[in-house]
A protein has these predicted regions:
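Intrinsically disordered, low-complexity segments enriched in serine/proline and basic residues
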Residues: 5, 10-15
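Conserved beta-strand hairpin/beta-sheet module of binuclear metal-dependent hydrolase folds
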Residues: 17-72, 182-194, 198
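Metallo-beta-lactamase
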Residues: 58-60, 117-171, 177-241, 245-249
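Active-site metal-binding motif and surrounding structural segment of the metallo-beta-lactamase
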Residues: 63-109
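Short histidine/acidic/glycine/proline-rich micro-motifs that form metal-
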Residues: 112-116, 247
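Internal alpha/beta domain cores that form substrate/cofactor-binding pockets in large enzymes
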Residues: 218-235, 240, 248-283
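C-terminal regulatory/interaction regions
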Residues: 267-336
């Protein structure tokens, strides 16, 4: 695994009432209020009066994003970009609705994601397949298509200049085939989407983050996820911005935790991936594994509190592991 010197200290900014958390270098996390507070973030980047969003949350997040612009005394005309790290609808679902308010903004997306933003029908159906119709209706809002002429696709390694500095996009499969990360080499910050795990601030112990991999359906691939984690570490970032949730430091320790987590998930899937009642058994074992990690992390919360924080992720991770296990089994059967 790629290693770099780990001299970063945990640094955390305070959350303010509006759900905006300010970090260094004109970066703010905006709580999109998806599912529960501090669960799903959009990032607002501000450079010399110009603005960009990294991910948007769902369509229901749009009022929060517009309010954040207002709070920062920015106009809707000042937004140049919406960077979508990937097109899962808890991060890209609001882009079409937000774009209607932003006359000058364009959307940067992975080439595999672009067609599904122009016509989101399949994306909506797939998301309903994962979460169920009632949950989707209550938590995602109306997903609007994005006009093709406002989309730009990012090639692997694309560097581009915005306002006062260069940024780079790296294609990073593992969580999703349509995923890229955005790298700001001056701030030394990676916007990692879901590629550097999920880490909720309610599970911090003494300012130290707890992180677990996100193996959401349907593209989870463990070897690609290991590679992507290493690729992020190799950049030697001072901080990584996660969609779930906020900015984390101590990158090398978290990367090691993520590598171990991916291996643990795969072992659990291997034990239960083809058996009857596998969803329940994999879910139970994932919770036990996470609980043991939390104990070692110094967390003292009871099982009920841990279930409240982790159950949705466990459900998604199990579904993603099953997709992966079935894909591996099918490829063995067909000899590919
Ligand atoms: Zn995702």
């Amino acid at each position: 695994m790629t290693m770099a010197s780990d001299d970063q200290k945990p640094a955390r900014a305070g959350f303010c009432m509006s759900g905006i958390t300010d970090f260094a270098d004109g970066i703010s996390a905006i709580d999109t209020h998806h599912i529960r507070p501090a669960s799903d973030a959009s990032y607002l980047l501000i450079r010399e009066g110009r603005a960009a969003f990294v991910d948007t949350g769902t369509a229901l997040a749009v009022p929060h994003l517009l309010a954040a612009l207002q709070e920062k005394q920015l106009t809707v005309e000042s937004v140049d970009w919406i960077f979508l790290t990937h097109i899962h609808l808890d991060h890209a679902g609001g882009a079409g609705a937000l774009l209607k308010h932003l006359p000058n903004a364009r959307v940067l997306v992975h080439p595999k994601g672009a067609p599904h933003l122009v016509d989101p029908t399949k994306l909506i159906q797939a998301t309903i397949g994962v979460y169920g119709e009632a949950f989707f209706a209550a938590t995602y809002g109306k997903i609007l298509p994005i006009p093709a002429d406002r989309l730009q696709v990012t090639e692997e390694g694309l560097s581009f200049f915005w306002v006062d500095r260069s940024y780079q996009c790296l294609h990073t499969p593992g969580h999703a085939l349509h995923h890229y990360v955005l790298w700001d080499p001056i701030a030394r910050v990676v916007f990692a989407g879901d590629n550097f795990g999920v880490s909720y601030r309610e599970l911090d112990v003494n300012g130290h983050a707890f992180v677990i991999p996100a193996t959401t359906p349907t593209h989870f691939d463990p070897s690609e996820m290991h590679r992507t984690i290493d690729r992020i570490v190799a950049l030697q970032p001072a901080a990584v911005c996660l969609t779930h949730y906020g900015q984390v430091t101590e990158i090398n320790r978290l990367a090691e935790d993520l590598h171990r987590g991916v291996d643990a998930y795969v072992a659990i899937a291997g034990r239960h991936g083809a058996g009857p009642d596998r969803v329940r058994r994999m879910g139970d074992e994932l919770f036990e594994w996470m609980s043991a990690q939390l104990d070692a992390h110094g967390d003292r919360a009871d099982a009920k509190t841990r279930h409240a924080a982790l159950d949705l992720d466990i459900d998604l991770n199990v579904q993603g592991l099953i997709y992966w296990a079935d894909r591996v089994a099918a490829s063995k059967l067909s000899g590919t």
